[in-house]
Amino acid sequence: MALVLAAAGAVTVVQFRDAAHEADPDGALRGLTDDITADLVRELVTILPIVLVIAAVAAYLLSRAALRPVDRIRAAAQTLTTTPHPDTDAPLPVPPTDDEIAWLATTLNTMLTRLQRALAHEQQFVADASHELRTPLALLTTELELRCAGPDPPTS
């Protein structure tokens, strides 16, 4: 037999031994703890799956929100690599936070700037080399055309 007393917000459970547990002096306490354990297991089996689902959904949403800046950087880099003539002056987006993702975006933008400068130097070198090669070839072509066109001019 159990008696539950509630007063001033405190709950007290008083368990009286019954005749079935007369031979066992701790029978009343053992029966009470078995009941409490069974209730606790039943509540955990009911509540734990719900808590796990809520935690999984919260973790998924939180990770998506945390990785959104990385996805923006990835999309901008993908645009740069798939566009035939990308706007290389448009940098990758840098999130307004002062964390590793912002540092990564800043570093990638610095690298892109250096690559643009290197490409510009290479294009200038090719243009200069092309000009330097065309000038002697043009002179040779002109001289050959003149020689093929007529007799040699008199030499003095």
From Swiss-Prot:
Residues 64-120 form the HAMP domain. One of its GO terms (biological process) is negative regulation of phosphorelay signal transduction system. InterPro entries: HAMP_dom, HisK_dim/P_sf, TCS_sensor_his_kinase. Its EC number is 2.7.13.3. The chain crosses the membrane at residues 43-63. It catalyses: ATP + protein L-histidine = ADP + protein N-phospho-L-histidine. The keyword Ubl conjugation does not apply. Residues 64-156 are cytoplasmic. One of its GO terms (cellular component) is plasma membrane. Pfam families: HAMP. Its main location: membrane. It is found in: Cell membrane. Residues 128-156 form the Histidine kinase domain. Residues 1-42 are extracellular. Phosphorylated by HK1. Signal peptide: none annotated. HK1 and HK2 are merged into a single protein with a distinct N-terminal sequence in strain CDC 1551 / Oshkosh. Member of the three-protein two-component system HK1/HK2/TcrA. HK2 transfers its phosphoryl group to TcrA. Homodimer. Each monomer interacts with HK1 and the receiver domain of TcrA. This is Sensor histidine kinase component HK2. It comes from Mycobacterium tuberculosis (strain ATCC 25618 / H37Rv).
